[in-house]
Amino acid sequence: MAIERGAKVRILRKESYWYREVGTVASVDKSEKTIYPVTVRFEKVNYSGINTNNFGVSELEEVEA
């Protein structure tokens, strides 16, 4: 199952501020050369005041909305 824009996803990257948190996919880059093609938007901000981050498809788990 491919991850699409608007999907709810759980973050599996352990070093991420949002590890195990749920966010919404803001965009997906279809280019094969992109290492982190999925941009995810979160409700809360990190230490720098940022609420988006890019992740690889293998670092995400789609959850039921």
UniProtKB/Swiss-Prot annotation:
Main location class: membrane
Protein location: Cell inner membrane
One GO term (biological process): photosynthesis
Protein name: Photosystem I reaction center subunit IV
Gene3D superfamilies to which the protein is assigned, alphabetical: 2.30.30.50
Gene: psaE
Described purpose of this protein according to its UniProt entry: Stabilizes the interaction between PsaC and the PSI core, assists the docking of the ferredoxin to PSI and interacts with ferredoxin-NADP oxidoreductase.
SUBUNIT field: The G.violaceus PSI reaction center is composed of one copy each of PsaA,B,C,D,E,F,L,M and Z, and forms trimeric complexes.
Family: Belongs to the PsaE family.
Protein's UniProt keywords contain Zinc-finger: no
Example of a GO cellular component annotation carried by this entry: photosystem I reaction center
Keywords from the named record: Cell inner membrane, Cell membrane, Membrane, Photosynthesis, Photosystem I
Annotated membrane topology: Peripheral membrane protein
